[in-house]
Amino acid sequence: NKFAEVFNNIIFDTNKYSEIEIKDKMIEIINSKIETYSNLALYYLIDKKLVKNQNEIKNLFDKVISNTKDFEHKNLVIFKKALYFSDKFNEIELLEILNPLINSESVWKSHALYLMAEYFYADNQNQKAKEFFNQIISLENSNIDLRLQAEKRLNRDLSE
């Protein structure tokens, strides 16, 4: 696979390329629609801070999400998008991103609920935080660690 080769050449020999070349090649990989390498290229760009424009990052996430076929893999990318923007977006924008997870039976649902609960808790919106923490606890298939964290937060910080 040509794109696998390009990706590996870049990450194992970054000194051969300028930042602009790396960015352009990674975006080319994202546009290739090859799931594994599109994801890796996006995370590389973000990790190395090669894309500064938040709107461009949002668009790159959207491309990767739309090209990801596997349900849970797509949901993971959606969650990572929300996580990335959690300190940049308001609650409406975050909920827009996370609604596909919150309204599904995805394994990432409890993670999405936890992110929103912590978002509201950090913003002193304790009633909303409680609602999201309680949803995690009442979920049948919620992540065990997140359920414990939600219970701790409710008992320690949000009890009346």
What is the role of each PLM region?
Residues 49, 64-160:
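Soluble extracytoplasmic domains of inner/organellar membrane proteins
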Residues 1-14:
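Alpha-helical transmembrane signal-anchor/signal-peptide segments
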Residues 9-12, 44-45, 117:
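A ubiquitous short alpha-helical element
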Residues 3, 16-20, 54-55, 91, ...:
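TPR-repeat structural position
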Residues 19-71:
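Extracytoplasmic/periplasmic/luminal assembly and interaction segments
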Residues 15, 20, 24, 156-160:
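Low-complexity, Pro/Thr/Ser/Glu-rich flexible segments characteristic
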